[in-house]
């Protein structure tokens, strides 16, 4: 449960079906279903995307796989892995960084320390 994740109107339904959604996600992940990070739910505020990482890992996904679901795995599902999803020469990349390693502690993703888009640094606190 993440406080204030859902508006009051949606909260009762979310509390009822939330555990079922988590269980379904866990089953899909364990079965090898390809999972892309993101949502079109329309109930989450912009900038709260980091909470999805917490939900994914709480449902049994490894931290590393959760991070990959937001990068290379989504690029593969969209069939753009030749230009997106990795940091290497020739690829398009917007980069974010954290003070701590999110593979070791996924909750660190809520504190972005560095943002670079199209080669321009928009935030740098490290």
Language-model region placement:
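Short aromatic-centered micro-motifs
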Residues: 115
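Small/polar (Gly/Ser/Thr/Ala-rich) solvent-exposed segments
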Residues: 104
């Amino acid at each position: 449960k993440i406080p204030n994740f859902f508006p009051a109107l949606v909260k009762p339904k979310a509390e009822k079906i939330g555990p079922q959604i988590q269980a379904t996600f866990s089953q899909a992940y364990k079965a090898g279903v390809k999972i892309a990070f993101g949502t079109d739910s329309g109930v989450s505020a912009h900038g709260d995307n980091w909470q999805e990482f917490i939900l994914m890992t709480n449902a049994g996904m490894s931290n590393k796989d959760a991070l990959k679901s937001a990068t290379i795995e989504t690029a593969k599902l969209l069939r753009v892995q030749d230009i997106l999803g990795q940091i290497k020469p020739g690829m398009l990349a917007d980069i974010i960084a954290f003070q701590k390693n999110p593979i070791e502690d996924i909750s660190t993703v809520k504190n972005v320390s560095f943002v670079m888009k199209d080669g321009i640094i928009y935030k740098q606190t490290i």
